[in-house]
Every structure is written in structure tokens, then in C-alpha cells.
Amino acid sequence: MITTVGEISARRKTIILASCCLSLLIVSMDSTIVNVAIPPAIRTDLHATASQMQWVIDIYTLVLASLLMLSGATGDRFGRRRIFQIGLATFAVGSLLCSLAPDIDTLIGARLVQGFGGSMMNPVALSIISQIFVGRVERARALGLWGAVVGISMALGPIVGGFLIEAISWRAVFWINLPSARPPSSSRRSSSPESKSATMRDIDPVGQLLAVLALFGVVFVLIEGPGMGWTNPRILAIAAGAAVALLAFLRYESRRHDPFIDLRFFRSVPFSSATVIAVCAFAAWGGLPLHDVAVPAGGSAAIRQPTPV
């Protein structure tokens, strides 16, 4: 039997909102909680190089960002609750693999699995909230709480991560995801009714593939370039491939009726400015722990902080 929105009690709506916010909390917190584990716990235990430490942080957020829109469109087409629960299970499996990783390469691969699962949770959970809370006031409150959780989770990450590392081990920063990931999928009360979009958007696999190739190419060059050398043939080839993918993406999306990303948004100065500011802020947020590794002992005490201030 399909439950309609009108049949959902206020109590169940609250439980669903809490479940969606919890999923956002663990996904967003995982983008910062690992930062404090990099220097020096993971580096020492798994004998990681500078580039490998960067991949531990970047592969998660890269996969998460690359697949957000695809996951949202998939949820609209095949069912939001179904995709959300698949993402939750995938994220939990990735977290378990991270905690058991015997070497740095396995940890990087497990972080990729985490990012894949997280990409299915956040956009679909937001769609579920918008679907459940139909009233103008209650939807505004629900989305306001959803946005607040983002800031709270990113602030909690370094604090919780530092405590777990000191008290237990760096592996504990991944254990915390396992009990947190269980309630939304295991409780019927916290499960939202299955829903799909009335108007199906095209998934746009070509645009998605070009975007992923461009992003991965740029990140690979930035991470591996200093170690391999900027004139290394492999670096030059990947940089050229990323540039071609980016140009092809811009050309393809500008001519598509239902694009993966509507490029007209970037004509808006406020939108473009906010995007640039967000990119710079997150780059600084993720880069500070890695910079801490490079600063020699006795260096600037103001810079040698394991977490952003």
C-alpha cells in the first residue's frame, strides 16, 4: 500500500526529517573528520606519501560532488526511498572497509565507495524532505534545519575526530558511521513513503561522463604533478585530456535541451561569486591539515593547527 503525504502524521514527519538530517550529518562530517586523522596517525600507520594523503581526502569529496546530480535524477526516476537506502548501505560498507584498511591504497578505494554512497544520500534526502513537507511554512523550517546541519557537521568533524583518535584510534573515525547509518534504513517509522518525480529528467550520461573526466583529470594533475613533475608525459597527457573533456562538456551542455548543468546559472554574478568563494573556502578547509604535515617542527605555531579555525 502506498502512503500519501496527507496520511503521514506530524510525528512520523519529524522522524523522517531527523533520519534525513542524520544522513546529511554523517556524510558531511566525513569530509572533515578524516582531516585530523591524516597528520600524523594515518600517515605513520599506513606509511602514506603526501600525494596519497591528499587522495584520502579528495577522492571522497570528488566522487561525492561528481555524482550528486546523477544520483538525484536517478532517485526521481527509480524511487527516492530505494536510492536513499542503497546509498546508506553503500556508505556503511565503505566506512567499514575504511576502518579495516590494511594499507593506504585500500583506504583510498574504500573512501571512493564512501563517496559513491554519500552521493546517493544527500540529494535524495533533500528531495524526500521537499516531498514530505508540502506546507510553505513547514517546508521552510525543515529546509532551514537541513541547512543548519551542514554547518554543524563540518564543525563537529574535527572535534569528534580528534577525540576518537586520542581515545581509541584513527580507525574509530569510520566506526562512528556504522551505528549512525543504521536507524534510517532499519526503522519503518523513519522510512518515507516511496515517491518518484512526475516529470522525468534525462540522466544525461554524456554530460555526466565529461564532467567526471574533467574533474578527475584536474585533481589528478594537481595532486600528482608536484611529485611526478609538471613536464612528465603522463601529467601532460592527463592535463590535455581534462582540458578537452571540459571544452567538450561546455559545448555539449550549451546545446542540450535538458542539460546536466544549466550553464546559464553562471551568467549570474551572485551565483558565480558564491561558487568561487565556496571553492576557495573548501580548498582552504581541506588543505590546512596537509599543510601542517609539510611545516617542519618549530615552524609557525599559528599555521600548525590540525583543524581549521
Question: Predicted segment positions?
Answer:
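A membrane-interface helix-boundary motif in multi-pass transporters
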Residues: 166-178, 223-235, 303-306
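Hydrophobic/aromatic residues in alpha-helical transmembrane segments
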Residues: 34, 58, 71, 109, ...
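12-transmembrane solute porter fold
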Residues: 15-29, 34-36, 47-50, 167, ...
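Cytoplasmic-side transmembrane-helix entry/capping segments in multi-pass membrane proteins
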Residues: 86, 138-150, 200-210, 235, ...
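Transmembrane-helix bundle of Major Facilitator Superfamily
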Residues: 2-190
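Flexible interhelical linker loops that connect adjacent transmembrane helices
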Residues: 6-7, 14, 185-212, 254-269
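Short helix-capping/hinge motifs at transmembrane helix termini and TM-loop junctions
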Residues: 71-72, 101-102, 134, 191-194, ...
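C-terminal membrane-cytosol helix-exit motif in multi-pass small-molecule transporters
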Residues: 126, 178-197, 212-224, 240-256
